[in-house]
């Protein structure tokens, strides 16, 4: 038997007046998701616990059975692992956005127009930076998918207790990065980062990629916004923890990084952009191939619904959910326990993550079937799983796969 957890990133939402009180998931035509719900057991899930606005990183860790409060040191190390950087003890890693700033250093687009190309050239320019007075700090910078990138600082006397530069909204300048614990290490790191942010604008505003984007009426990627500082955590390998050979199919560096740090085989998919324009057919083919291989467990993350939620794109979110549904019919099998869920809610009305629970459906051999006949936030709440937490998912899956040890006599 194989176990598959498919996470549609940010799929869950809230009822909207524009949809006559329905959520985007309820409004979408999802015959395959409905079939999964009808053939299995359903419920709603708090990725971490009720009311917690989970990040994609902490929610995935929780769903995989890791305690995010113990192993999560920040987003940066996972992003770095996801783009293939060998982060060493003492390194401090950050997730970065390519963003757009005007001549007054006001952020006008936090994602540089959802930039898709040219980022490798921009990254090489950042990677060549040195900061005067801090020549002992090596700057390692690499692009990830879309507007995402990774920064690693390597050198003596650095600390990870620093704040973020990202103002979280347009119309404001980058936040001044501050030491959070007052230590000399964190103060040094904060000073280096503030210089990097300022000097990134100076060296990127006339970069050929950006002059070309401006000529085409596109937002330039002329500044970087570091956030999510973290040192490399110790994470127990998934196969050691569960005795399951595992693979990860994901689009973003963040989730690939979780796969890498937990020891999964990470399968790259050409055309997987992490956006609503992603090549779902290629993703489907990669999933089918992985299911046919000798893996016991697959973690799958598809990201476009989250992007649409962050952009407030209601129609785009509905359409993307329908596109995902169209690839699911070919992925079911008689020897597969298939779990369909989201990692958090990203309501289009909020344009950010919220603490609302997400729907979850589990189907497979001898799964107890409840009376739910469609897959949505509202329908799943009436299911046999009732309300669970992300940390329950692996226990339930292992029990179904007959991989769970008995507790007690």
Swiss-Prot record:
Q: Which GO terms describe its biological process?
A: glycolytic process
Q: Superkingdom of this entry's organism?
A: Archaea
The protein's UniProt keywords, in alphabetical order, are: Glycolysis, Isomerase
Q: Secretion signal: which residues? A: none
Which InterPro entries does this one have?
Answer: Alkaline_phosphatase_core_sf (IPR017850), ApgAM_prokaryotes (IPR023665), Metalloenzyme (IPR006124), Pglycerate_mutase_ApgM (IPR004456), Pglycerate_mutase_ApgM_sf (IPR042253)
Q: Tell me the route in metabolism or biology where this protein functions.
A: Carbohydrate degradation; glycolysis; pyruvate from D-glyceraldehyde 3-phosphate: step 3/5
* Region of interest (Disordered), ranges: 163-184
Broadest EC class assigned to this enzyme: isomerase
Gene3D superfamilies named among the record's database cross-references: Alkaline Phosphatase, subunit A, Metalloenzyme domain
GO molecular function annotation: metal ion binding; phosphoglycerate mutase activity
Task: Cite the record's Basic and acidic residues compositional bias ranges.
Answer: 163-173
* Keyword Isomerase found: yes
HAMAP family for this protein:
ApgM_A
Enumerate the PANTHER family for this protein.
Answer: COFACTOR-INDEPENDENT PHOSPHOGLYCERATE MUTASE, METALLOENZYME DOMAIN-CONTAINING PROTEIN
Give the record's family classification. Answer: Belongs to the BPG-independent phosphoglycerate mutase family. A-PGAM subfamily.
* NCBIfam families to which the protein is assigned, alphabetical: apgM, PRK04024.1
Q: What is this protein called?
A: 2,3-bisphosphoglycerate-independent phosphoglycerate mutase 1
Organism expressing this protein natively: Methanothermobacter thermautotrophicus (strain ATCC 29096 / DSM 1053 / JCM 10044 / NBRC 100330 / Delta H) (Methanobacterium thermoautotrophicum)
């Amino acid at each position: 038997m194989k176990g598959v957890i498919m996470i549609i990133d940010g799929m869950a939402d809230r009822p909207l007046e524009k949809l006559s009180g329905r959520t985007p998931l309820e409004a979408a035509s999802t015959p395959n998701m409905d079939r999964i719900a009808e053939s299995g057991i359903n419920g709603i899930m708090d990725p971490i616990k009720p009311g917690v606005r989970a990040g994609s990183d902490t929610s995935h860790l929780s769903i995989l059975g890791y305690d995010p409060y113990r192993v999560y040191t920040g987003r940066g190390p996972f992003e770095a692992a996801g783009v293939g950087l060998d982060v060493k003890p003492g390194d401090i890693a950050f997730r970065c956005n390519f963003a757009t700033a005007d001549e007054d250093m006001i952020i006008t687009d936090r994602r540089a127009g959802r930039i898709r190309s040219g980022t490798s050239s921009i990254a090489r320019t950042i990677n060549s930076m040195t900061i005067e007075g801090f020549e002992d700090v090596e700057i390692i910078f690499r692009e990830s998918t879309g507007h995402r990138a990774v920064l690693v600082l390597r050198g003596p006397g650095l600390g990870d207790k620093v704040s973020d530069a990202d103002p979280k909204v347009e119309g404001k300048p980058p936040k001044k990065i501050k030491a959070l614990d007052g230590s000399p290490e964190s103060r040094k790191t904060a000073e280096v980062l503030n210089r990097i942010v300022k000097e990134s604008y100076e060296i990127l505003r006339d970069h050929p990629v950006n002059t070309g984007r401006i000529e085409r009426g596109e937002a330039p990627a002329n500044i970087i916004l570091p956030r999510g500082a973290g040192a490399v955590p110790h994470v127990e390998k998934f196969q050691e923890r569960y005795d399951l050979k595992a693979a990860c199919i994901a689009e973003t560096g963040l989730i690939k990084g979780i796969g890498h740090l937990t020891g999964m085989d990470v399968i790259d998919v050409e055309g997987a952009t992490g956006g609503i324009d992603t090549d779902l057919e290629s993703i489907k083919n990669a999933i089918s191939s992985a299911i046919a291989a000798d893996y016991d467990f697959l973690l799958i993350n598809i990201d476009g619904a989250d992007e649409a939620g962050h952009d407030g794109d209601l129609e785009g979110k509905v359409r993307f959910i329908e596109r995902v549904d169209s690839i699911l019919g070919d992925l079911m099998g008689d020897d597969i326990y298939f779990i369909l869920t989201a990692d958090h809610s990203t309501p289009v009305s909020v344009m950010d993550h919220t603490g609302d629970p997400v729907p979850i459906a589990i189907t497979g051999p001898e799964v107890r079937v409840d009376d739910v006949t469609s897959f949505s936030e509202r329908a799943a709440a009436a299911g046999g799983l009732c309300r669970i937490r992300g940390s329950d998912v692996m226990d339930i899956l292992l029990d179904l796969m007959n991989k769970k040890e008995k507790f007690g006599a």
